[in-house]
Amino acid sequence: MSKSVPLQRIVLVAALMATGGLAGGCSSIDRLAAIGERPALTPIENPTTQPGYKPVQMPMPKPEVASYNANSLWRNGSRAFFKDQRAAKVGDILTVTVNFTDKANIANETQRSRTSKEDSGITDFIGSKTITTPATAVLPGRILTTDSTSSSDGKGSVQRQEALQTNVAAVVTQVLPNGNLVVEGKQEIRVNFEIRELIVAGIVRPEDIQSDNTIDSSKIAQARIAYGGRGQITDVQQPRYGQQVMDVLLPF
């Protein structure tokens, strides 16, 4: 039995290493092939042809048929008398001003304590006090005694402060039936061996687009803003595959 325990441990470790190797095998091969080279920028592609792209579907009002009046320059349903150069059609470009500042402080403290004690016994059962036989030995005055104490003390706090200020150009990928625009923009900046990526997507109203063809990120509905990177610095900040596998499998 003493020899089988180390063998079981070896098998378990080997299985974990194999799992981690399979999980990151393809990624590791690509990283080995790119040693000493700068991370490559992704090619410019049509966002609607990317894997996983899904058109946005939102509740829409009933369509209204535009009518024209004789000798009138105004069309019913028009939102402006003169045409401007702001983004309005699929393929048009507008600038998104990302101005994000978030700060949160949360503190929780919980204390709980409980003490319970119970005694149970038989002092007299069918004249057991008058009977002097060995049977009286099984009828003690105290049969069961329980005593329990439990306590819980928990503290938690969250302190978070984030800020992001930048501009990114976005492309109109879809025009909804009510006139709202679905936009998506991606920006990549490479500095030495690190690439910083900024992705902005969401739904905007044409009325919220300013005269200089810009819009603030706070006016984007269903906004999806992602800011991250990839490269040598990001690799150092990420835990190794083996550690990630152990964190998932180990229950303690």
From Swiss-Prot:
GO MF term set: cytoskeletal motor activity
The UniProt entry's GO biological process terms, in alphabetical order, are: bacterial-type flagellum-dependent cell motility
Question: N-palmitoyl cysteine lipidation sites on this chain?
Answer: 26
> Which Pfam families does this one have?
FlgH (PF02107)
Localisation per UniProt entry = Cell outer membrane; Bacterial flagellum basal body
Does the UniProt entry include the keyword Chloroplast? no
Topology relative to the membrane, per the entry? Lipid-anchor
Q: Which InterPro entries match?
A: Flag_Lring
Primary location class = membrane
Q: Which UniProt keywords apply?
A: Bacterial flagellum, Cell outer membrane, Lipoprotein, Membrane, Palmitate, Signal
Q: Which residues form the signal peptide?
A: 1-25
- Report the sequence similarity comment from the record: Belongs to the FlgH family.
Any idea what job this protein has? Assembles around the rod to form the L-ring and probably protects the motor/basal body from shearing forces during rotation.
The record's listing under NCBIfam families reads: PRK00249.1-5
Write down what this protein is called.
Flagellar L-ring protein
Q: Which gene encodes it?
A: flgH
